[in-house]
C-alpha cells in the first residue's frame, strides 16, 4: 500500500489522572457506569475468531472476588479445534495487517486510546473493579490511565525504532534497515491484575505488524473482552487479533505445537513461564518451528524496601504501606519484604507503620469509598494466604504486628498483615505470596553491607526495590551494591507505580526477560530486522587493486 508522505505523530503525553473526590463529576461518572454494568451481569462472552463470535457451549465463569456468589461473566471456552481455527484466521489476516502502513496502524491504537480516555473510561474501570476487585483509584491508574499511555507511547517508540537507520553510506550506496513483523503469529497470555498489561500484551506486537492470539486470564475475561471490542471499534482488522478464552494448558499446547508460532508475550507466574519456556525450548530442539520464537515475559517478584537510619521516617512508612497494600499486594511490583535500620525502627517507624496499617479499611470498592484494601482474586489465592497467616500465628520466629485474619464468607478478604521476624532467611522473606502480607526485618545500623547481601541473595527474583536515605553517600553506595537486585530501582519512593514514558518496567533473574514494557525495547522484540544495501554504481572488474 502506498503512502505519499512521512507523517509525524501527534504530541504524545501521559493521560492526566482524574481524582474522584466527594461530589465530583468523575465520582458520579464511575458510580453510574458501575451500577449500569452491575445491572447487566452476568455478561456472556464468546470466543472470537476472524471477527466472528463463536459459541463453544463449554462455559467458564468469572466471579466477583468481593462477592463470590456473583457471576460477572459467563464465557465460552475455546477447545483445541477453535484454537487451530484462530491460528489459521490469524495467518490468513497477516498479509493485510502487515501491509497496512505504520501511520494507519498507529491511528488505530491512538483512536483506541482516545476511546478509552473518553467513551469507555468508566466502563472499563467498572469492569476492572467488579471483576478484579480494584477500588476506584487502582482502577483509574490501570484501566483509566496506564492502558492509554501504553497505546500512545508505543506509537512514539515504534516511530523512533523505524527511524533507527545506518549512520554511514559509502558513495554510491544507500543503506537501510527495515523492521519486519515476525514470520508467524504471536501468542499473548494475559494476567488478571492489570487491564493495562492485558491490553499491551496484545497491542505491542500488533502495532509492529504482527498477528496475535490473545488468551485472557480466567479472572479478567470481562475487562479483556471490552479491550478487544475497543480495538475493533478503533479499526483493527478482524484477522489481526483473535480472542480465545479457554484452558491455559489446552490453548498453549495447540499454539506451541504449530510450526508458525513466532512469539510469546506473557505476564504471570515464574513457575508457569519456566514451564512454557521449557516446552518451547524442547520444540526448538526438535526443529518444530519455522523460526526461533521470541519469548518475552514478566513474572514474579519478592520486592524490597531498605530503610536507612538517615531516612525521613514518615515518608518511608507511607511509601511502604502503599507499596505493600495497594490492590491487596497483587501487583507484580508490590512490596513484600522490608528491611529497616534499628535506629529508624525504634525512633518512630514501628509505631507509625503499625498505626497506618491498622487504620486501613477493608471491603468492596463502592460499599465505602474509604476502603483501601479489597479482596484477593480467587479462592486459591485466599487459601494460600490464609495458610501463611495461620502458620505465622503459631511460629515462634514471627511476631504479628498487624492483621493476621482472613474471611471468605462473602468475598476473599485478607487483612493487611505485617509480620516481624529476626530470621532474615525465613520463608516469609523468600517465597512470593502475592497478597497483603508484609515481612519486616530490623537490621543493626552498622550491618548495612550484610543487609545488602541479604536483599541481593535471599530470593531468586529481581523485579523492583527501593531505598530510603537522606545521606547521599549512602544513596550512592546502596545504588551500586544493589545494582542487580531490581530491574526497577527507586530512591526515596515506593517500589510500585512505574509510569509509561517515565520508568520502563521489568526485571531480570527469575522475574522475567527484562524487556521493559513501556519502552522501545519491548517493541524491538517483536520485529525481525532486515538490512538492505542499495548500490547505485556498476561493478566493472572481478579483480581488486591488490590482485595487480
UniProtKB/Swiss-Prot annotation:
Catalytic residue list: 298 (proton acceptor), 332 (nucleophile)
Gene Ontology cellular component list: cytosol; mitochondrial matrix
Pfam families from the UniProt entry: Aldedh
Gene3D superfamilies: Aldehyde Dehydrogenase, Chain A, domain 1, Aldehyde Dehydrogenase, Chain A, domain 2
Keyword Phosphoprotein attributed: yes
Residues the record lists as Phosphoserine modifications: 391, 394, 396
Catalytic activity as recorded in UniProt: L-glutamate 5-semialdehyde + NAD(+) + H2O = L-glutamate + NADH + 2 H(+)
GO annotation, biological process: proline catabolic process to glutamate
One Gene Ontology molecular-function label: 1-pyrroline-5-carboxylate dehydrogenase activity
Keywords, comma-separated and alphabetical: NAD, Oxidoreductase, Phosphoprotein, Proline metabolism
Name of protein: Probable delta-1-pyrroline-5-carboxylate dehydrogenase
Amino acid at each position: 500500500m502506498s503512502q505519499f508522505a512521512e507523517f509525524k505523530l501527534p504530541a504524545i503525553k501521559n493521560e492526566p489522572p482524574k481524582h474522584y473526590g466527594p461530589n465530583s463529576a468523575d465520582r458520579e461518572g464511575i458510580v453510574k457506569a458501575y451500577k449500569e454494568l452491575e445491572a447487566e451481569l452476568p455478561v456472556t462472552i464468546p470466543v472470537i475468531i476472524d471477527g466472528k463470535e463463536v459459541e463453544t457451549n463449554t462455559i467458564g465463569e468469572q466471579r466477583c472476588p468481593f462477592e463470590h456468589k456473583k457471576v460477572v461473566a459467563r464465557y465460552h471456552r475455546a477447545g483445541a479445534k477453535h484454537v487451530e481455527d484462530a491460528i489459521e484466521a490469524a495467518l490468513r489476516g497477516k498479509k493485510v495487517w502487515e501491509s497496512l502502513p505504520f501511520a494507519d496502524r498507529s491511528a488505530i491504537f491512538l483512536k483506541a486510546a482516545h476511546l478509552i480516555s473518553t467513551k469507555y473510561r468508566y466502563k472499563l474501570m467498572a469492569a476492572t473493579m467488579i471483576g478484579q476487585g480494584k477500588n476506584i483509584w487502582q482502577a483509574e491508574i490501570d484501566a483509566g490511565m496506564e492502558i492509554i499511555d501504553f497505546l500512545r507511547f508505543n506509537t512514539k517508540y515504534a516511530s523512533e525504532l523505524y527511524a533507527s537507520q545506518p549512520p554511514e553510506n559509502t558513495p554510491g550506496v544507500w543503506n537501510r534497515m527495515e523492521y519486519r513483523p515476525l514470520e508467524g503469529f504471536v501468542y499473548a497470555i494475559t494476567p488478571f491484575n492489570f487491564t493495562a498489561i492485558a491490553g499491551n500484551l496484545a497491542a505491542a506486537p500488533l502495532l509492529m505488524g504482527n498477528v496475535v492470539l490473545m488468551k485472557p486470564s480466567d479472572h479478567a475475561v470481562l475487562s479483556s473482552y471490552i479491550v478487544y471490542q475497543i480495538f475493533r471499534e478503533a479499526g483493527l482488522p478482524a484477522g489481526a487479533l483473535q480472542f480465545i478464552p479457554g484452558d491455559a494448558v489446552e490453548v498453549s499446547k495447540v499454539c506451541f505445537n504449530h510450526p508458525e508460532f513466532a512469539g510469546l508475550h506473557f505476564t504471570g507466574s515464574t513457575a508457569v513461564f519456566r514451564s512454557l519456556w521449557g516446552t518451547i525450548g524442547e520444540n526448538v530442539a526438535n526443529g518444530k518451528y519455522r523460526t526461533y520464537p521470541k519469548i518475552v515475559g514478566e513474572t514474579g517478584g519478592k520486592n524490597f524496601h531498605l530503610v536507612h537510619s538517615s531516612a525521613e521516617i514518615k515518608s518511608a512508612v507511607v511509601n511502604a504501606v502503599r507499596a505493600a497494600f495497594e490492590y491487596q499486594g497483587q501487583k507484580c511490583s508490590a512490596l513484600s519484604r522490608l528491611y529497616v535500620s534499628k535506629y529508624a525502627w525504634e525512633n518512630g517507624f514501628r509505631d507509625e507503620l503499625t498505626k497506618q496499617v491498622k487504620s486501613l479499611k477493608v471491603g468492596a470498592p463502592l460499599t465505602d469509598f474509604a476502603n483501601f484494601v479489597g479482596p484477593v482474586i480467587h479462592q486459591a489465592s485466599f487459601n494460600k494466604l490464609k495458610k501463611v497467616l495461620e502458620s505465622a500465628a503459631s511460629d515462634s520466629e514471627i511476631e504479628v504486628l498487624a492483621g493476621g485474619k482472613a474471611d471468605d464468607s462473602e468475598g476473599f478478604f485478607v487483612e493487611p498483615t505485617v509480620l516481624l521476624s529476626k530470621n532474615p532467611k525465613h520463608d516469609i522473606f523468600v517465597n512470593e505470596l502475592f497478597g497483603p502480607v508484609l515481612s519486616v526485618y530490623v537490621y543493626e545500623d552498622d550491618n548495612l553491607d550484610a543487609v545488602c547481601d541479604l536483599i541481593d541473595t535471599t530470593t531468586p527474583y529481581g523485579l523492583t526495590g527501593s531505598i530510603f536515605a537522606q545521606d547521599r553517600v549512602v544513596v550512592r553506595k546502596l545504588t551500586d551494591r544493589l545494582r542487580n537486585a531490581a530491574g526497577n530501582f527507586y530512591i526515596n519512593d515506593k517500589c510500585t507505580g512505574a509510569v509509561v514514558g517515565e520508568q520502563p518496567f521489568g526485571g531480570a533473574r527469575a522475574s522475567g526477560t527484562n524487556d521493559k514494557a513501556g519502552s522501545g525495547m519491548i517493541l524491538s522484540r517483536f520485529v525481525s530486522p532486515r538490512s538492505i544495501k542499495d548500490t547505485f554504481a556498476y561493478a566493472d572488474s572481478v579483480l581488486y587493486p591488490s590482485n595487480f
